[in-house]
Amino acid sequence: MTSEIRNPELWREGELKIEWVRRHMPLLAGLEKEFKESKPFKGKKIALSVHLEAKTAHLCEILAEGGAEMYITGSNPLSTQDDIAAALVHEGLNVFAVHGATEEEYFRGIRKVIEVGPNIIIDDGGDLVNMIHTEYRELIPNVIGGCEETTTGILRLEAMNKAKELEFPMMLVNNADCKHLFENRYGTGQSVWDGINRTTNLIVAGKNVVVAGYGWCGKGVSMRAKGLGADVIVTEIDPIRAMEAVMDGFKVMSMSEAAAVGDIFVTVTGCNDVITADHFMKMKDGAICCNAGHFDVEVAVAALKKMAVGHAPARNNIEAYKLENGNTIYIIAEGRLVNLAAGDGHPAEIMDMSFAIQALSAKYLVDNEKTICREKGQMLNAVPREIDNEVANRKLADWGISIDKLTPEQSKYLYGGH
């Protein structure tokens, strides 16, 4: 099968990026050595829909070293980096993704990696799993199981599982402690502001930053905005999270209220229509909107285009929309993921943990192929605590940190037994 990428000649630039993250992902380096010897994925086809940048490319390399036949596509039209795709193809992996893909090109890539009949699926947002269930049902028996990286993808899986429409086991990677406690909070917090700052080149200190959603990602974005000197306002639909935001020192109000006072808006919800036409009309002249959730539906860009009396590029990756009231609203990266469409994503050291969870979860599926539950309605699987702890212990060891252990007497005191 011939790969479909933008320009194979870009592989040298991509290789430099991948080499940089290799040096900063020691957990994956250890797994690469182990997988190279044990070949846990020998004879298996792995299909991935991922944000195709240097760190995910390194994960693909690790799985390939483990014996897998790799088929890779993007999970977002703007997050694929063409030089990274070229580097992977140069290494002999199969890639079907281009930066700036049209909707047709994007779903063509999804179809390409499904049509090979994968045994393991690694998904980011749920498009791969959804399509195999709706358009390629004859290939479902080939699938041992899959891994889902995101909150949005897990919500889609939960809906499918509840309706008994999910027909193979899925590992809920996003729910692992070593994933959401670190990547979602610290990774998103840093990478979102990296994307915003490098794109706008504006100061954050003294501005009103509105963060929509106070899950782990929203907490990270809010924390880093506060650290940059912003006055942070949180909007929420969950009363518990709203109280948590208040007690963390942030203002909480409805989006309708926040729209009138915000300078920078960041959506981190995974839901659609978080910022709508009504909100745009209330915003200040020069308000900046961006999305750090998943799909490009959180900020209603399509509605903004319809209501604008004109729009034009304001700067690379920023579009200016002129409203009939005379105000201008700025949208970063077309409302797609600001940390990937306008940046390089989460820091390598953070993704080292998340991708170690991914790799070990994929291995878990293969190791437990004959015993894992395949009953409809019971297809969702937590990452085993042993895997979570293994990743945490490896990371601490890499940092040169040792921690205490319970004595037998302490263990008996806490948990009983003899």
Model-derived regions: residue spans:
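Glycine/serine-rich phosphate-binding loop and adjoining beta1-alpha1 elements at the start
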Residues: 1-41, 72-80, 85-207, 415
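Adenosine-phosphate binding glycine-rich loop
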Residues: 10-25, 41-45, 53, 168-206, ...
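Rossmann-fold NAD(P) dinucleotide-binding segment
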Residues: 30-33, 64, 115, 129-130, ...
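ADP-ribose/adenylate-binding Rossmann-like module
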Residues: 74, 121-124, 137-152, 271, ...
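Ligand-binding pocket scaffold of soluble enzyme catalytic domains
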Residues: 5-7, 16, 29, 36-37, ...
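Gly/Ser/Thr-rich loops at beta-strand to alpha-helix junctions
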Residues: 48-56, 76-80, 126-128, 216
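Glycine-rich phosphate/diphosphate-binding loop of Rossmann-like nucleotide-binding domains
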Residues: 50-68, 183, 187-261, 267-269
